[in-house]
Curated annotation (Swiss-Prot):
One GO cellular component term noted in the UniProt record for this chain: cytosolic large ribosomal subunit
CDD domains the record matches: Ribosomal_L30
Pfam families from the UniProt entry: Ribosomal_L30
Recorded name of the encoding gene: rpmD
Name the record gives this protein: Large ribosomal subunit protein uL30
Length: 60
């Protein structure tokens, strides 16, 4: 299964509470922090909600 490397490129400060919770749930803490997440529907849905804050790369 492929994984997604998610990098926070914009701060979650001054964003909607739902968006801040998604950033925290994904394990992103600071700007330029990255995490590996599984490539599934739930993860893709969360990433879609905060697409304007992150950069996503596919890792094999």
């Amino acid at each position: 299964m492929a994984q997604l490397k998610v990098t926070l490129i914009h701060s979650a400060a001054h964003r909607l509470p739902k968006q801040r919770k998604i950033v925290e749930a994904l394990g992103l803490k600071r700007v330029n922090s990255s995490v590996l997440q599984p490539d599934n529907e739930a993860t893709r849905g969360a990433l879609f909600q905060i697409a304007h804050l992150i950069k996503v790369e596919e890792v094999k």
